[in-house]
Amino acid sequence: MSPSEYAREVAKRRTFAIISHPDAGKTTITEKVLLFGQAIQVAGTVKGRGSSQHAKSDWMEMEKQRGISITTSVMQFPYHDCLVNLLDTPGHEDFSEDTYRTLTAVDCCLMVIDAAKGVEDRTRKLMEVTRLRDTPILTFMNKLDRDIRDPMELLDEVESELRIACAPITWPIGCGKLFKGVYHLYKDETYLYQSGKGHTIQEVRVIKGLDNPLLDTAVGEDLAAQLREELELVQGASTEFEEEAFLNGQLTPVFFGTALGNFGVDHMLDGLVAWAPAPMPRMTDVRKVSADEEKFSGFVFKIQANMDPKHRDRVAFMRVVSGRYDKGMKLRQVRTGKDVVIADALTFMAGDRAHVEEAYPGDIIGLHNHGTIQIGDTFTQGEEMKFTGIPNFAPELFRRIRLRDPLKQKQLLKGLVQLSEEGAVQVFRPVANNDLIVGAVGVLQFDVVVARLKSEYNVEAIYESVNVSTARWVECDDVKKFDEFQRKNELHLALDGGDNLAYIAPTMVNLNLTQERYPEVRFRKTREH
């Protein structure tokens, strides 16, 4: 393959994730984006309880029952002359760890905001994570077919709460029952909305020019006058779109529409392929790796168990950073120092898998994993380096887990260790006894673990409360001091799923006192994979 062909393949890749508060319409937008990418023909509606058409990107049992996306799916589709990789992140308020890690694998994010509610709590948290790497953000103000807050107010709120400048690209005409469409500030065109056409790609009527009398006829004189008035304000008060500020994460282009009505999603996609960056460089512990390098490198940011109910398998999701993956290629797994032949990597359309012959920077491929791959693993063509910045967070909630049938202890431990390797939950085994303590960042993770232990490992487990309020990973350079620390604090020490030593504190006061007592021991809140 010639360097120019390779460069062309890299340049057309766009890899992004959608971030939003639960129920802001993320799964619906995912559906509609895939519809435009022609990946699915009729978009499945998400929330209908008991309806057999499940949304394409929610595929685990529990997600199907609850109507929320629990695990990160990956979907690739063509749009214009680009190839877009969309990483779907869990929308429920709990699933933060998986989501945080997914954001390390993308080059750009789409923030979906419910225009009736504005900026919500989860959106704030996720924006903080994108800030760590100055990820470029596009914004979609959703649900214009309902009654929404004043659009100017929404922009002000995003600017003040999320500290990012807003540049409106489209502007709404009416909302709720009176929603007529949007005006495109940079193309000087009005796109008219028709309700009830959400399942397919609409033929949208376009009116050129803001002063076109056809506009008054189409939306009514009152709304047309209101639009012209608002636009004068907008053009006076808001920021112009600047690509450089967008790429530095300082400015977000804002689009208005309704995902359910499939209106406005294509304007956002047009913006995404036009402005979002092609695959970006990534830092390792040795140097920066850029996408145009010939040699292959990539990192694992997520492990997903049982994507195929017929096989008890696990798949490691790897983001390709540089070079081209070819079927049957030999790669070095840096952590273990072993060379492995990757003959059957996968590509995804949420749960439908296809074997991939080749993959380029920006692509996400799945590696079959029988317990040898961990989150954060780097694969190269021999170079010794490790990609950095893939975090593990100290859990905030703890429960003791035990069996209804004590004979299944082995399966329980196996299930918990596998689920912890996947990042679904963290498991701690106290040094002093045989308890198993499960730590999570959100309550829903506990339900997921019990449900998955039952369906995948046939283990019935129940929770009990446990006297643990927080955990910290501990390390120390002074062997003698560390031995003394371990001897005196045996009752509070535990090993996590990867056999790393952690201090599990009954109270914050206890933790603070212990930290004061042993200044030479480092107590860490996060652990790099």
UniProtKB/Swiss-Prot annotation:
A Pfam family reported for this protein in Swiss-Prot or TrEMBL: RF3_C
Binding site for GTP: 20-27, 88-92, 142-145
GO biological process per UniProt: regulation of translational termination
Gene3D superfamilies listed in its UniProt record: P-loop containing nucleotide triphosphate hydrolases (3.40.50.300), Peptide chain release factor 3, domain III (3.30.70.3280)
Listed GO MF terms: GTP binding; GTPase activity; guanosine tetraphosphate binding; translation release factor activity, codon nonspecific; translation release factor activity, codon specific
Domain of life of the native organism: Bacteria
Cellular component annotations (GO), alphabetically ordered: cytosol
The protein's name: Peptide chain release factor 3
Protein species of origin: Edwardsiella ictaluri (strain 93-146)
Subcellular compartments: Cytoplasm
Keyword set, alphabetical order: Cytoplasm, GTP-binding, Nucleotide-binding, Protein biosynthesis
Domain (tr-type G) ranges: 11-280
Family: Belongs to the TRAFAC class translation factor GTPase superfamily. Classic translation factor GTPase family. PrfC subfamily.
UniProt keyword annotation of Iron present: no
Principal place of residence: cytoplasm
Function: Increases the formation of ribosomal termination complexes and stimulates activities of RF-1 and RF-2. It binds guanine nucleotides and has strong preference for UGA stop codons. It may interact directly with the ribosome. The stimulation of RF-1 and RF-2 is significantly reduced by GTP and GDP, but not by GMP.
